[in-house]
Swiss-Prot record:
UniProt-recorded name of the protein: Enoyl-[acyl-carrier-protein] reductase [NADH] 2
Role: Involved in the final reduction of the elongation cycle of fatty acid synthesis (FAS II). Catalyzes the reduction of a carbon-carbon double bond in an enoyl moiety that is covalently linked to an acyl carrier protein (ACP).
Biological process terms in GO annotation: fatty acid biosynthetic process
Pfam families: Eno-Rase_FAD_bd, Eno-Rase_NADH_b, Enoyl_reductase
Gene: fabV2
UniProt catalytic activity: a 2,3-saturated acyl-[ACP] + NAD(+) = a (2E)-enoyl-[ACP] + NADH + H(+)
Residues at the active site: Y237
Residues annotated for substrate binding in this entry: Y227
Superkingdom field: Bacteria
Family: Belongs to the TER reductase family.
The entry's keywords: Fatty acid biosynthesis, Fatty acid metabolism, Lipid biosynthesis, Lipid metabolism, NAD, Oxidoreductase
Length: 400
């Protein structure tokens, strides 16, 4: 069979397995030639390891200098009668293959990271086959739902404002059109539920569970990822349900840092730049900002994707020559620093007001935006024969 891209709105309904393989290899090739991670961790757990920042973290730490053994947890779907499976499924497989070829452990756990059963499986594996202790825990779970650990009822996140409704343009990748979308005002319950799903509660619970099991090494670090952005995005992000959840995440880092300091450990949130990820394309009215930002940063030669961001985080912030991790006044690591430089934001603001539904494909970097989205799912990568006939049976034999 020949696998074609299928996009519905901003959701990819298909993935190209060997395009995903190429994307993983491209990221590995980048970190192998970048400034290396020195004095880095050797045993790493990545929660949410199959795409975006989680996958990039795993690649950076394994191949970007530290030569870390990694465990990745993700909720992905393999090939079945419903289709070829998700991009993350293949990212996991091909990462593991590359890691093992390099003499590293790249263990994948496929399932629900929120369940006690998954935690126990991971802890058992750490104790019996992974050397017993972790040097770093990366928390990069991006999901819209989380079960209440006591009742099993689902909390569902909402991307809404906490003030007046906001109307703004958003992009439909399926139709290559820009459409107006209104973001409504969240109810108190929606605000609370979003905090439960996207805040720091589950991160803290994981760290507590791992600590109680005795699998955190002395000096272990943990990091989660966040976004703050410029004032131009505040109404939809910073001052909305997402911003409230991220504030909870930031506060959680401080609480975890206090706990982990007793064993020489540290906990941080790294604030990253705006990027095209499976999660970010869902944020209404956010895409015009990304179109303008990408164009300006590429023109200036300072654009970064997930892998560049993570390599810079681990080589220049969390590890390396810094004996003290550089943070801002709120104890946040800032790798959004280039995005927020004054001259870049000035140019982005000037460009945003010029972007319209008629000209967005040329005025902003829509080609780059769409290419990033397609590449998340294994399409549009050089070196891949997209006309090749792929045997479905072969895909079912690939082992995660």
């Amino acid at each position: 069979m020949i696998i074609e891209p299928v996009v519905k709105g901003v959701v990819a309904r298909s993935a190209h397995p060997f395009g995903c393989q190429q994307a993983v290899r491209n990221q590995i090739n980048y970190v192998r030639t970048a400034d290396p991670v020195t004095d880095g961790p050797k045993k790493v757990l990545v929660l949410g390891a199959s795409s975006g920042f989680g996958l990039a973290s795993r690649i950076s730490l394994a191949f970007g200098g530290s030569k870390a053994d990694t465990i990745g947890i993700s909720f992905e779907r393999g090939p079945s009668e419903k289709g070829v499976g998700t991009a993350g499924w293949y990212n996991n497989i091909f990462f593991r293959e590359e890691a093992e070829n390099a003499g590293l452990i790249g263990k994948n756990f496929i399932g629900d990271a929120f369940t006690p059963q998954m935690r126990q499986q991971v802890i058992d594996y750490i104790k019996t086959e992974f050397g017993g202790q972790l040097d770093l825990v990366v928390y990069s779970l991006a999901t819209g739902v989380r079960p209440n650990p006591e009742t099993g009822e689902l909390w569902r996140s909402s991307i809404k404002t906490m003030g007046e409704p906001v109307t703004g343009p958003t992009i439909n990748i399926e139709t290559d059109t820009m459409e107006q979308m209104t973001i409504g005002t969240a109810t108190p319950a929606e605000i609370e539920d979003t905090e439960k799903v996207m805040g720091g509660e589950d991160w803290a619970s994981w760290i507590d569970t791992l600590s109680e099991a005795g699998v955190l090494a002395t000096g272990c670090k943990t990091v989660a990822y966040s976004y703050v952005g410029p004032k131009a995005t505040y109404s939809i992000y910073h001052q909305g349900t997402l911003g409230r959840a991220k504030a909870h995440l930031h506060a959680t880092a401080d609480q975890l840092n206090d706990k982990m300091s007793e064993m020489g450990g540290e906990a941080y949130v790294s604030v990253c730049k705006a990027l095209v990820t499976k999660a970010s394309v869902f944020i209404p009215a956010f895409s015009p900002y990304i179109l303008a930002l990408f164009k300006v940063m590429k023109d200036k030669g300072v654009h970064e994707g997930c892998i560049e961001q993570m390599q810079r985080l681990y080589s220049q912030r969390l590890y390396g020559k810094n004996k003290i991790v550089p943070v801002d006044d709120s104890r946040l690591i800032r790798v959004d620093d280039w995005e927020l430089e004054e001259d870049i934001q000035q140019q982005v603001s000037e460009l945003m007001v010029k972007i319209t539904p008629e000209n967005f494909t040329t005025m902003g970097d829509y080609q780059g935006y769409k290419a990033d989205f397609m590449q998340l799912n294994g399409f549009g990568l050089e070196g891949v024969d997209y006309q090749a006939d792929i045997d479905f049976e072969t895909l079912t034999q690939l082992v995660a």
